[in-house]
Amino acid sequence: MRLRITVDIFSGRPNPTVELDGKKARDFLERVKPAKALKRGAMPSPEYRLGYRGLIVEQIRAPSRALPRMFRVAAGAIYGPELAHTIADPELEEFFAGPQGPAAKIKVLPDFSRFMIRQLRQLKEFREDFEPHRQHEPHRPRCLCAPLYEPAWWNDGGQKQWHNNCYNYACNYRTDTFRLTWGGGQPGAASGAMYTALTCAAVGPAAISDGLIANPAAHNRCPKEGHLVALVIAPGIDFHWYRKGRNGLWSHKPGSTPVTNVDNSGHLIPDPRTANRGMYTNFCTFMTVMHGHIKVA
């Protein structure tokens, strides 16, 4: 038996993965066995938020028939086809992220375990405060050159969703390369000038080398041509992009997860500068995407 476990936590860069074999894999599956069904109206799978969104578990060899081949564990619950339950061991994620857990082997950050534990705590706090509510879209000036907000086109649960990230979505440029090839969906990779640090000063120029146009004075106004995007940074950790739609509101795609038009508080996004962006605390700049004049790797 072998499991591939992806820590779904980044938006721009690929998420880290670990693999478990044999007894470790069997023990993990014992701990994630569905226990009690979640109540109707409970928080759904947290795919749409920025920051930690759970563990994506793939059974890649000798799968257990009691569980789907792929499922998500988040904040002590399991989500999958016809699954929305608490798990047998509600402390599983804390163990996974701890110094003796599999996350200790992840080296994408200097202290990934501590970072993951902090993010896990924030997700649980978000879950406890969650209150489902309906969104009413206010009337806003239209951006006639901007793409329509069509989440169903991107959210296919397959190739388009899994292998295009926030940069692909912001640029409205499908490549199907994210997580598959070096530089897939990364600013500057197509032009040979990929960023070398996760800062505004590094990621912004990398995007400009791909053909985006710096537009810091846009102040959330629709450009006369092309469409407006915005770059934000989790310093030293990750980057994220938003795009302004034809309805004047913003939307985004956190990594391989579905496209959404709400922020981490579940609110519509009239301005990304004031949205709840989670760990992406640095608002860098606005840029303009001229259709047909950019390239994404």
Predicted segments, located by residue:
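Substrate-binding/catalytic groove segments of enzymes
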Residues: A37-K39, R65, T177-T181, I237-R243, ...
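Function-determining sites in protein domains
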Residues: M1-R134
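Structured segments of extracytoplasmic/periplasmic soluble domains
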Residues: F28-L38, Y169-D176, A206, D210, ...
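N-terminal nucleophile
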Residues: G54-A62, D89, V229, P254, ...
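Residues that flank catalytic or metal-binding motifs in active/ligand-binding sites
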Residues: G51-R53, C166, G226, D238, ...
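Cysteine-nucleophile protease catalytic domains, especially the papain-like/related folds used
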Residues: P132-I213
